């Protein structure tokens, strides 16, 4: 898929030529899962799969929207006068949410837009298709209406849409990775301070393989919000005995010394993941900088174990992929990526072994689960941008 596909689709739907094309990537997180809302570090990167848009003006004061990913929905009109109406339960809620947040922040929409969207991110697979759409919309509206918003402002607008409009208490990682991505680099982001640095992802003879369970997951309907609430409860208990603003501020030793303050064993497990995952992320980013891929892979796998047993956000589909991935020749590490409860996992695989890896893991998954997983070799890409 490329920009030519969406310009052709635009003409078919709207009967005229598109004037602009845009792209926003998806993302994977190398390590640092469920730490972004706990004041910890994350280590994501944008990928070459993503969401494209072809855009043209119209004479109506309305956004006229079509997605090739949801063809049965057809063209949806959102008049400017309806921006602050309730959401409709459609993909267009993400467009409407971004538009209303930007309008509130001072954006001036001077004319209507026809927008044709098509993406090659599997919907609900944990590669941040919703955040990709949000950052795509933010880039379109910021560029075409001279909004003047900085990239980090667009990131925060996207988070606000998720939290206040869609109803998902997500952190900042997805929107940040998609808006700020750079080719062949991952971003070590401290979500507590929003300080970040780009680090080259040099895998030598290895590649990152994305493994899609093809079990669709819904953030708002999953236990994502429950996990965040559990971490907040654990933090509140710790704060009765020690001075700490977020779980991400604690070292492993500090946490172990103060677990007596958390009298619920489930909450201890949830908080332990947040604290130890943050430290794993720092160690992993250093290992990657040092070229120590063996240590990096071990930390990635340790993250997966913690997500399965302390945070309990995997399930049989993800566990089957990761367990079988780690049995294969040429694999340095593997774990689920994203929020969990279905979606995708990643594995670091020697490029010479990728074909056998996909065959073997795919066969084991099909035998255990009863349907196919899908596999993609990830290219680390630039962030959201205008293409023409």
Curated annotation (Swiss-Prot):
Chief location bin: cytoplasm
GO CC annotation terms, alphabetical: cytosol
Known catalytic reactions: alpha-D-galactose + ATP = alpha-D-galactose 1-phosphate + ADP + H(+)
Presence of the UniProt keyword ATP-binding in the record: yes
Pfam families (alphabetical): GalKase_gal_bdg (PF10509), GHMP_kinases_C (PF08544), GHMP_kinases_N (PF00288)
Keyword Cytoplasm: yes
UniProt-listed Gene3D superfamilies: 3.30.230.10, GHMP kinase, C-terminal domain
Pathway involvement of the protein, from the record: Carbohydrate metabolism; galactose metabolism
Enzyme class, spelled out: transferase
Binding site for substrate: 33-36, 224
Residues under site feature: Transition state stabilizer: 27
An example molecular function term from Gene Ontology annotations: magnesium ion binding
Protein EC: 2.7.1.6
GO biological process terms, semicolon-separated: galactose metabolic process
Cited SUPFAM superfamilies: GHMP Kinase, C-terminal domain, Ribosomal protein S5 domain 2-like
Keywords, in A-Z order: ATP-binding, Carbohydrate metabolism, Cytoplasm, Galactose metabolism, Kinase, Magnesium, Metal-binding, Nucleotide-binding, Transferase
Annotated binding of ATP, by residue: 67, 124-130
Entry annotation: catalytic residues: 174
Binding site for Mg(2+): 130, 162
Cell location: Cytoplasm
Family indicated by similarity: Belongs to the GHMP kinase family. GalK subfamily.
Function: Catalyzes the transfer of the gamma-phosphate of ATP to D-galactose to form alpha-D-galactose-1-phosphate (Gal-1-P).
Full protein name: Galactokinase
């Amino acid at each position: 898929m490329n920009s030519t596909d969406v310009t052709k689709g635009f003409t078919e739907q709207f009967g005229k030529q598109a004037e602009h094309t845009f792209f926003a990537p998806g993302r994977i997180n190398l390590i640092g899962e469920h730490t972004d809302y706990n004041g910890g570090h994350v280590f994501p990167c944008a990928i070459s799969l993503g969401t494209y848009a072809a855009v043209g003006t119209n004479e109506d004061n309305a956004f006229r929207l079509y997605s090739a990913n949801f063809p049965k929905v057809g063209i949806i009109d959102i008049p400017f006068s309806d921006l602050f109406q309730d959401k409709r339960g459609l993909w267009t809620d993400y467009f409407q949410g971004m538009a209303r947040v930007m309008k509130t922040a001072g954006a001036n929409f001077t004319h209507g837009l026809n927008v044709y969207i098509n993406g090659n991110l599997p919907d609900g697979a944990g590669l941040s298709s919703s955040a990709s759409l949000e950052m795509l919309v933010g880039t379109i509206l910021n560029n075409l209406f001279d909004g003047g918003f900085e990239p980090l402002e667009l990131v925060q607008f996207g988070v606000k849409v998720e939290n206040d409009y869609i109803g998902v208490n997500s952190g900042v990682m997805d929107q940040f990775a998609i808006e700020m991505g750079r080719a062949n680099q991952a971003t070590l982001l401290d979500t507590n301070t929003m300080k970040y640095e780009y680090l080259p992802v040099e895998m030598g003879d290895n590649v990152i393989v994305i493994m899609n369970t093809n079990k669709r997951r819904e953030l708002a309907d999953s236990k994502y919000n429950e996990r965040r609430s559990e971490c907040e409860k654990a933090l509140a208990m710790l704060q009765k005995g020690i001075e700490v603003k977020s779980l991400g501020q604690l070292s492993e030793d500090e946490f172990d010394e103060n677990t007596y303050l958390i009298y619920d064993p489930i909450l201890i497990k949830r908080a332990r993941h947040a604290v130890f995952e943050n430290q794993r992320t720092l160690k992993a980013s250093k290992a990657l900088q040092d070229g120590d891929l063996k240590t990096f892979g071990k930390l990635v796998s340790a993250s997966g174990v913690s997500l399965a047993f302390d945070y309990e956000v995997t399930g049989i589909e993800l566990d089957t992929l990761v367990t079988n991935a780690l049995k294969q020749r040429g694999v340095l590490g593997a774990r689920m990526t994203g929020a969990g409860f279905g979606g995708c996992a990643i594995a670091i695989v020697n490029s010479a072994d990728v074909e056998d890896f996909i065959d073997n893991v795919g066969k084991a998954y099909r035998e255990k689960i009863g349907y196919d997983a899908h596999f993609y070799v990830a290219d680390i890409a630039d962030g959201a941008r205008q293409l023409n």
